[in-house]
């Protein structure tokens, strides 16, 4: 417990998901400033948080079929951000970086990218341009398909990752037109 003020952001579309109740509910604590590696891989580091993690996990199944091994990292907190520089360690291993966020362009994904590139100095370890995949710069459409056309989808994640892989290895990952 702390007397320090805190802001917690909850993704509303996560409320609709059904999950098992954790057995350690009273004991579980998320350390502030620590990231969590959810999936280990060697080809590309994807950093995200909140409800987009499920979208990325769905895309990972298809990306693995395409021969791409994803390292998925949950940022968990922005201030402080990745105190142990675990994202930099991952980028050193994969040489590629994608930040996925359901917020508008220039939001949390831009902050995360700035922290990894400028504060953690990841530039020298990249084989391709680091990218952000965020929501479209418009108001979401109402209806059942509003999120699909406004926020990053499983298909968007797959396409973006595949293009990043193509950029550094076009022979192994040819573009399909």
Regions found by a protein language model. Give the residues of each.
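Thiamine diphosphate
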Residues: 12-177
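Internal gly/pro-rich beta-alpha loop/helix module
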Residues: 1-4
């Amino acid at each position: 417990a702390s007397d320090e003020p805190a802001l917690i952001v909850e993704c509303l579309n996560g409320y609709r998901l059904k999950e098992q109740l954790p057995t350690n509910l009273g004991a579980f604590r998320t350390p502030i400033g620590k990231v969590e590696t959810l999936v280990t891989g060697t080809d590309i580091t994807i950093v995200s948080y909140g409800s987009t993690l499920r979208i990325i996990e769905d895309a990972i199944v298809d990306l693995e079929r395409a021969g791409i091994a994803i390292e998925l990292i949950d940022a968990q907190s922005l201030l402080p951000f990745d105190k142990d520089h675990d994202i930099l360690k991952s980028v050193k291993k994969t040489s590629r970086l994608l930040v996925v966020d359901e917020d508008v362009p220039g939001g949390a994904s831009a902050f995360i990218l700035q922290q990894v590139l400028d504060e953690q100095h990841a530039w020298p370890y990249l084989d391709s341009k680091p990218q952000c995949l965020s929501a479209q710069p418009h108001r979401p459409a109402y209806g059942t398909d509003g999120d699909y056309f406004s926020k990053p989808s499983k298909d968007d994640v797959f396409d973006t990752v595949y293009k990043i892989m193509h950029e550094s290895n076009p022979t192994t990952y040819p573009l399909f037109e």
